[in-house]
UniProtKB/Swiss-Prot annotation:
Belongs to the nectin family. The keyword Membrane applies. Pfam families: C2-set_2, Ig_3, V-set. The lineage of its organism: Eukaryota, Metazoa, Chordata, Craniata, Vertebrata. It is found in: Cell membrane; Synapse; Cell projection, Axon. Glycans are attached at residues 31, 51, 291. It is a single-pass type I membrane protein. This is Cell adhesion molecule 2. GO terms for biological process: cell adhesion. Residues 389-435 are cytoplasmic. The gene is Cadm2.
Amino acid sequence: MIWKRSAVLRFYSVCGLLLQGSQGQFPLTQNVTVVEGGTAILTCRVDQNDNTSLQWSNPAQQTLYFDDKKALRDNRIELVRASWHELSISVSDVSLSDEGQYTCSLFTMPVKTSKAYLTVLGVPEKPQISGFSSPVMEGDLMQLTCKTSGSKPAADIRWFKNDKEIKDVKYLKEEDANRKTFTVSSTLDFRVDRSDDGVAVICRVDHESLNATPQVAMQVLEIHYTPSVKIIPSTPFPQEGQALTLTCESKGKPLPEPVLWTKDGAELPDPDRMVVSGRELNILFLNKTDNGTYRCEATNTIGQSSAEYVLIVHDVPNTLLPTTIIPSLTTAPVTTSVTITTSPSTSASSSSRRDPNSLAGQNGPDHALIGGIVAVVVFVTLCSIFLLGRYLARHKGTYLTNEAKGAEDAPDADTAIINAEGSQVNAEEKKEYFI
């Protein structure tokens, strides 16, 4: 009896030690998310382990690894690390069917387990845009649909036009036949105009499996519209005698045919002076008969449009020459006897010292006009000098004052003055008396 009692005590003591040691042993795992087709790594750790075995099993409770021994024949499952404190395995080429709850077991008494959930993300397929048929007429209502399949969870679709997001769209989500992935579609409705021609409409698919790199589909719009026409003159102030070019700018899709020019609702009246070259109308040597309304008309398969230009030919402005005022020459009574001589060469030389170039640069770059003005001024100056010389020559002679006239030696004085002249003849005829 004593031996049996001691054996029982030993057994309970061993069990107590085992239970006490196992209280610090517990497997630790983490949930894993992986993209379909990727590789998932499942890790189970034990901080305190007294050589107790670890095991991984799949959602179907099939053992994958028991310590370092592979239990399931699946080439996709490999051992990463096996020790008393860790058991890690990898599952490559993960599919949607691999998703579920995996179990790590620590074989203590009792057995302790930890769960790790494997989430598999379904990658959405490249989106496709439908509903566009080229070409589209200006003003038509367009409906575009963007669709993508195979996403898990359901993907998000966004629309952009000219890099600006469009919010007013319709969104539809449908579950695929495998009941695991989704097909998502979005519809965009808008009315087009000519500004939409050549614009890229983008459908963008956002999903957590794409690693911040969204998938996109693009549709470039082709819009047909009637031409728009504008006439641009080569000068804003056409004058008589000048040339004028009228350019007809026309934009449309399809491209407009060659433009048609008319004047006042009829054909151009003077084809020799009014030459049409492409989209330009060239009018040579404008005159008053060219006044009128010119019309440019452009046509394509969608329609036609026109623009008008009213031509008014202005007169050439007259250039006024500067006038020169010649002062009148008057004589005043002289109270002393004076002999006056003239030297035309001296006056001419003093006048010729004027620099004609000083007049240049005052009235713009018309050198011919400036030269004419200078010539007129010089001519008038020379004429004035000539007339002044003739006047002084005719009045040259000997003059006596009243005092000289009553003096006794007046004849001698006259003779002295006459002799001083030397070259004068008939001095008596040159005498003048003032009373």
